[in-house]
């Protein structure tokens, strides 16, 4: 059983949803992102998303765009991101890691090389935001060969007819984009989730994680009532960015504040029981 499957099986047994925080690799530097990765796992993250910095992150709002720019200035590369995963795996072999990003860096790195290196490093899944469903074969055979899940995005605008098509080649879990538009701009209501999550469940038996617009413990708790996991990204990056010093470095106090937020989010999702 994969780490992702084992984690969601455990969450089902515990009768609760999980927390998936996001960290941008190398934001604002390698050391800080490595500290955040380890700290998130220690503070209650059930899975962790790692952003692969890219020069043109079209689906991301200003927060993650700026994080990517900071990371690239710090020397972020795809090889460096895989190095972060490898270092994390040396001390934690249980928390699943999902790389999230765009197709171009993977193609530049080389698809077969990327999937082999990602598997060797300990990557469990990838979310490729701009990979069209009809072009999944660019990656899918290589990902399957190395037992890495291809996690697909679906949205409120994904029709009932389109859902099975998009999810046909997906594995691990479904990432439900709860809003239309770029990341971190607003949030879905309980009414939205109560309407939309059952519609997605009819199309798949995979777990459903909800992201794009989940910022607070209260919002994460709302997601936990309907979905299998809550994804929190922009709020954590905003907290980190607000505390950077004049040299763009992250003082220990702001790293600790971000991890305190992760702990609060984890407590919030643990306090909710899934709606029947």
UniProtKB/Swiss-Prot annotation:
Domain of life of the native organism: Bacteria
CDD domains recorded: Tryptophan_synthase_alpha
Positions annotated as active site in the UniProt record: 49, 60
Catalytic activity as recorded in UniProt: (1S,2R)-1-C-(indol-3-yl)glycerol 3-phosphate + L-serine = D-glyceraldehyde 3-phosphate + L-tryptophan + H2O
Molecular functions per Gene Ontology: tryptophan synthase activity
Keyword Lipid biosynthesis set for record: no
Top EC class, one word: lyase
Pathway per the UniProt entry: Amino-acid biosynthesis; L-tryptophan biosynthesis; L-tryptophan from chorismate: step 5/5
Keywords: Amino-acid biosynthesis, Aromatic amino acid biosynthesis, Lyase, Tryptophan biosynthesis
GO cellular component, one term: cytosol
EC number per UniProt: 4.2.1.20
Oligomeric and partner information: Tetramer of two alpha and two beta chains.
HAMAP family: Trp_synth_alpha
Stated role: The alpha subunit is responsible for the aldol cleavage of indoleglycerol phosphate to indole and glyceraldehyde 3-phosphate.
Family from the record: Belongs to the TrpA family.
Record's protein name: Tryptophan synthase alpha chain
Organism: Acidiphilium cryptum (strain JF-5)
Name of the encoding gene: trpA
